[in-house]
A protein has these predicted regions:
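Active-site neighborhood of phospho(di)ester-bond hydrolases with catalytic His/Asp-centered motifs
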Residues: 48-50, 72-80, 100-103, 163-166, ...
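Metallo-beta-lactamase
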Residues: 5-8, 102-224, 229-233
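Short helix-loop-beta junction
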Residues: 270-284, 302, 359-360
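A short, aliphatic-rich alpha-helical micro-motif
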Residues: 69, 157, 297-301
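Helix-loop-strand module that forms the ligand-binding subsite of alpha/beta enzymes
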Residues: 292-360
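Conserved beta-strand hairpin/beta-sheet module of binuclear metal-dependent hydrolase folds
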Residues: 3-65, 154-157, 161-165, 265
């Protein structure tokens, strides 16, 4: 397992997890994901982020193709979530860095995760605008709180024109390609939307505050902690896409979700879809039983109307439908309009039951 040189003296040393199908335990990643970590070879050899629990061996193996792990001088932690720092103890034990840089909030998270294990770690908290020289390269830190954790920050290297963006601009893509331009373009866009609408969406106000800062930087490459690295034209494309997704402007498309017992509600769902079609509105029908709730949320990335259907079951609705609605509500899409429908044998409460769970 070799390191991949993405720029002169800058390497990808992460790992690909082809078997990670439930991202964060709630969003499907059917082809797996990547845990990206990066290494800069300089007077102060610097590792940026680590990998998930159980994956330290892969990182250290790749790193070992460039230098010995104990030659790492600095470690930068952009984000303390365990899919990036769950291997921190093993990496620090192997590398023994002289300094570890992270945000103040990350330092608090680190203490919560590792307690007495970190009492001898040389951790230094940094804030927005702080910079360090590692030789030919300078690293500038920018806090991005609630994008998507309180401890989040990004690291910018002006000499290499690269932004190490942690979870921002990421996707769940597992494969041997490292760059966006090596991957099928339509799939990249779909995966970026899937990631944003299932992970980042509630923090869209923070995205809109952060994007002007990102646009002010001279960037030729964005290196996220998941998925593919953007370079050249794809840098502007992913920044523009994030702005569009964060703005959540109304889109002329509807998504109809439903569950059914004896196909009556299913027939109604298709009838509703036909009504949209007859009026020139693109629409998609999705069974809550057949589609994971993260797939439904991804479909809503291009829609601003949600219609929900369920038969009445025990004076309420079928559980798959309510599960999907609860998930959507937690992600707080801001422009959804729509309605509810249902079928029944003798009571018919289901449409009214949706009102308390409607994702407004």
């Amino acid at each position: 397992m070799n390191a991949v040189e993405i720029l002169k003296d800058i390497y990808w040393v992460g790992c690909v997890d082809y078997d990670h199908y439930d991202f964060h335990g709630y969003s499907k990643s059917p082809e797996g994901t990547t845990y990206n970590a990066y290494f800069i070879k300089d007077e102060k050899n610097t590792l940026i982020d680590t990998v998930a629990p159980g994956k330290a061996g892969t990182l250290l193996c790749r790193l070992g193709h460039v230098i010995k792990p104990e030659q790492v001088d600095y470690l930068v932690i952009n984000h303390m979530e365990l899919d990036h720092e769950g291997s921190l103890c093993e990496v620090i034990s192997a590398c023994k860095p002289e300094k570890i840089f992270c945000s103040t909030m990350a330092l608090k998270s680190m203490a919560g995760y590792y307690g007495d294990k970190m009492k001898d770690w040389p951790v230094q908290a940094v804030k927005s605008g702080d910079k360090i020289s590692i030789g030919k390269h300078t690293l500038v830190f920018q806090e991005t709180r609630m994008l998507h954790w309180p401890d989040s920050m990004v690291t910018y290297c002006p000499e290499a024109k690269i932004l190490f963006s942690q979870d921002a601009f990421g996707q769940n893509i597992a494969g041997t390609e490292r760059f966006v331009d090596e991957h099928e373009h339509g799939d990249f866009i779909r995966r970026a939307k899937e990631y944003y609408f299932n992970i980042v969406l509630p923090y869209s106000p923070q995205v809109l505050k952060t994007l002007p800062v990102v646009r002010s930087l001279d960037i030729d490459m964005i290196a996220p902690d998941h998925g593919l690295i953007s370079r050249n034209e794809s840098v502007k494309e992913i920044i523009d896409l994030y702005e569009t997704m964060a703005e959540q402007k109304p889109r002329k498309r509807a998504v109809i979700i439903y569950d059914t017992m004896w196909h009556s509600t299913e027939q109604m769902a298709y009838a509703v879809c036909s009504g949209f079609e007859d009026n020139g509105v693109p629409a998609t029908v999705m069974s809550c039983k057949a589609n994971h709730h993260s797939a439904i949320m991804t479909a809503l990335s291009d829609a601003s109307c949600l219609v929900v259907g369920s038969p009445t079951h025990n004076n309420t609705v079928l559980p798959y439908v309510m599960s999907a609605l609860t998930y959507i509500k937690g992600l707080r899409p801001k422009i959804l309009v729509g309605g509810a429908f249902g079928s029944y044998g003798w009571s018919g409460e289901s449409p009214r039951c949706f009102s308390s769970s409607w994702p407004t």
